[in-house]
Regions:
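Sequence/structural signature of beta-propeller modules
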Residues: 1-47
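Structural signature of eukaryotic scaffold interfaces centered on beta-propeller domains
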Residues: 2-21, 68-91, 133-144, 188-194
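Short loop/turn segments immediately following the C-termini of beta-strands
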Residues: 30-32, 98-100, 110, 152-154
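Short, solvent-exposed loop/turn segments at conserved positions within beta-propeller repeat blades
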Residues: 34-37, 90, 100-103, 155-160
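A short loop-to-beta-strand structural motif that recurs across blades of beta-propeller domains
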Residues: 40-42, 104-106, 162-164
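Blade-loop segments of beta-propeller domains
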Residues: 53-139
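Asp-box/WD-like beta-propeller blade repeats and closely related beta-sheet repeat scaffolds
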Residues: 109-194
């Protein structure tokens, strides 16, 4: 059996730029009305040749109100090809979607039908806090040895914030990623590799 990397993983930025363009976009739809309805993930057709170009073609409600969906991203990317921690068999199919206000993390499967994404897992804030010591997940980045998430602060609403990791396959929180956070107190965004 030959293992083949996900075709959306590219060995260079040049190869990524030469790849076919995306035809769908996933967009967080926040409900800031206070009416008790949840946020949603909507699917927008971005294929200029499509009859439904620019229209919402899919919709998935979150299971709880008040999440405030934030900087979400894919579970896997080209970093899975990294020679020191290769995971060429992971597939870019899950959106990892943090709720900034609720501290929940939603795992949304975009297959088998990318227009009908389904929530397959919700990581509750108590689990994030117990395993990482953080809350308010903010930004996700896929990485060679896990999925990295920045967190704005601690479960008590104060600092310190930092970065924690999720497992590529189970999406379970693995714990804090950084060894030493330095002088920063509240976390925000981050850029792996810098």
């Amino acid at each position: 059996m030959l293992l083949k990397a996900d075709p959306t993983f590219y060995a260079s930025p040049k190869l990524a730029m030469q790849a076919p363009k995306e035809t769908l976009a996933y967009v967080a739809a926040l409900n800031a009305t206070g009416n008790g309805k949840p946020d949603a993930m909507v699917v927008v057709d971005v294929d200029p040749a499509s009859k439904s170009f620019g229209q919402i073609v899919g919709h998935t409600d979150m299971p709880n109100a008040g999440d405030e969906l934030h900087h979400f991203g894919w579970n896997a990317c080209s970093s899975a090809l990294c020679p020191y921690a290769a995971h060429p068999h992971v597939e870019r199919r899950y959106l990892v979607v943090p709720g900034l206000r609720s501290s929940r993390i939603h795992i949304i499967d975009t297959k088998p039908d990318p227009r009908k994404p389904k929530i397959v897992k919700v990581i509750e804030p108590e689990d994030v806090a117990a395993r990482t010591g953080y809350s308010r997940p903010h930004t996700i980045h896929c990485g060679p040895d896990g999925i990295y998430m920045s967190a704005l602060g601690a479960p008590n609403g104060d600092g310190p914030g930092g970065i924690f990791a999720l497992d590529h396959y189970t999406f379970e929180p693995l714990g804090r990623w950084e060894v030493e956070r330095g002088p920063q107190y509240f976390g925000y965004d981050f850029a792996p590799g810098i």
